Amino acid sequence: MTRNHPQPSRRTVLGSAAAAAFTLVTGTGTARATGPRAGWPEDFPLPDGWLPEGITIGARPYAYFGSRANGGVYRADLRTGEGRVLYEGAAGLASIGLKLDRDGLLYVAGGGGGTARVVDARTGGLVATHRLTAATGHFVNDVVLLGDRAWFTDSREAVLYGVPRGRRGTVRALPLTGDWEQLPDVNNANGVVGTPDGRGLIVVKSTPGELYRVDLRTGRATRIALSGAEDVVNGDGLLRLGRTLYVVQNRLNKVTVFELDPGVTKATLRRTITDPRFDVPTTAARFGDRLYLVNARFTSPQTPETTFSAVAVPL
């Protein structure tokens, strides 16, 4: 079920074809006009008690952070580190992974609520709410924009959800088959990105720490062989730049960087990024020559007084 809200979607005005083509051309769906300059902060605070997990950055120097506490969205200026709450959320909502498209629409994974929401990044207005699955027994975790759909992972069910990025179409549930074996009572599918050719998806399975290539026509998941690393356990957010894949391993406080082979059958470890400022980083986004990560601090008390931050490291 989809509920459309009063705020009009700019995608329905501009049409989905241009934005879909943009995503396929760039591979990451994000343009970079200028990069960070000297003096831009390398870390900055988020609101106390925000309980962040997801981050997304578009062509302009603004980062957007979802809240597990109330489903809100916070926008921070990368030039100053200052920000404001863009979307207030509401009691009982959660915002986990999120992605910003070219038209200024935020696609937001709703966690245990089983929904996906679309928020106008300019006004903070709620554009649409999509019911993906039941509100119990599921966890809608992360999202990637690919072609004319936003694809969401479900950590508790072997299925992906394709939400149409326009006025027409229905939500598509794509069961994962092939090499995929769903494990009970743990987080399975987590971070997701498109393949370099734009025809499929790469999904990280947090437990036991594996990467998969998914065929969007059939749902067949093929395990990607790792070279130089035994696993990517606690794999959370993914970022792909060309054939370079960044895997955020949250509780291990590191980002592992792999090179993908042309067929996306093998991932070779090239380096590991660590930083003393990491405090259970969950997801990452790029702006210029920096990688911005959000510290979810899962190992600390999650209270209204808990402090949170975002940090930047060189790519």
Locate the predicted segments by residue.
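Conserved beta-strand positions in repeat-built beta-propeller and related beta-rich domains
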Residues: 64-69, 106-113, 151-157, 195-196, ...
